[in-house]
Amino acid sequence: MKRGLVILACICAVIGGVYVAGSKWAIRHQTLDLFDATRQRPVSVDLAVRRDYEMQASEGTRTLPVALISNGNTVKNTEYSFLENVLAARGYLVASIQQDLPSDPPLVTKVGMPYVGRLDVYKRGEANILFVVDELKKIEPNANYDHLTLVGHSNGGDIAMYTAKEHPGLVSKVITLDNLRVPFVHSDKMKILSFRSNDPNFKTDPGVLPTPEQAKAEGIDIVRTPFQHTWMSDRGPEEARDEIQATLDKFLGESTNSDLSPVATDNPLIAKIGPGPYP
């Protein structure tokens, strides 16, 4: 009997592995080198979409939800494939935007100024997002551009939160990975998930995070992790990326199309992730 159970378990593992591999191969990635003539600015985008859902959208039988990822400072927009794949597996049309260019002024911190002197950076990021949305409408008209999901890491998370604050009617979800400067949007019409690092070199500004009472009342999910700030990209160890993927998948979980495993806690979005081991 035990031998039979072992064989069955092995078969299930093989089938599961094939399904996971198949779903990842089924996600199409494409680089878009766009140019905003109004601002004379190039905007590079890494596009990700499930091939089967893309085909259904082209046939007019499916409308794709849209997610836009904003990169962290010094991290490339192509270094968030672990997030792109979760979102695409859930059926999203995903655009990972290169928010900064080598020609941009360096990111500085000016204590005492609004958003520590980075308002122009956030406005530029907001303009990039709106420009990409307009370009995506030409490429994939059968997508929902009225209820966007904005995702961002570090400075990109601040751009996502700032854009959501400026355009609450366009944004339905915000997912940030250790944004430090822009206070959270308070709206019962917007779902928010935020992963927080345990990195002494990256401290969140006062007033950015909601109080526990506000988070509970407004349904904001704060996930405290043992991870370093830079681990919240493809640069992070596999264990960290897997934990973030699983929690993100559960947050998105209106459908059951994703092959990602749920996190193994009773209330994963409120509980801490961890403890590891993590390198």
Regions found by a protein language model. Give the residues of each.
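C-terminal catalytic histidine-bearing segment of alpha/beta-hydrolase fold enzymes
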Residues: 217-279
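Serine-hydrolase catalytic machinery in alpha/beta-hydrolase-like enzymes
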Residues: 36-143
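Primarily recognizes the serine-hydrolase "nucleophile elbow" in alpha/beta-hydrolase
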Residues: 134-188
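An N-terminal hydrophobic leader/cap segment in hydrolases
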Residues: 4-56, 260-264, 268-279
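Conserved alpha/beta-hydrolase "acid-adjacent" motif
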Residues: 201-207
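Loop/turn elements at helix/coil->beta-strand transitions in domains of secreted/extracellular proteins
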Residues: 63-66, 90-93, 145-147, 169-173, ...
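Short beta-strand/loop motif that positions the catalytic acidic residue
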Residues: 193-196
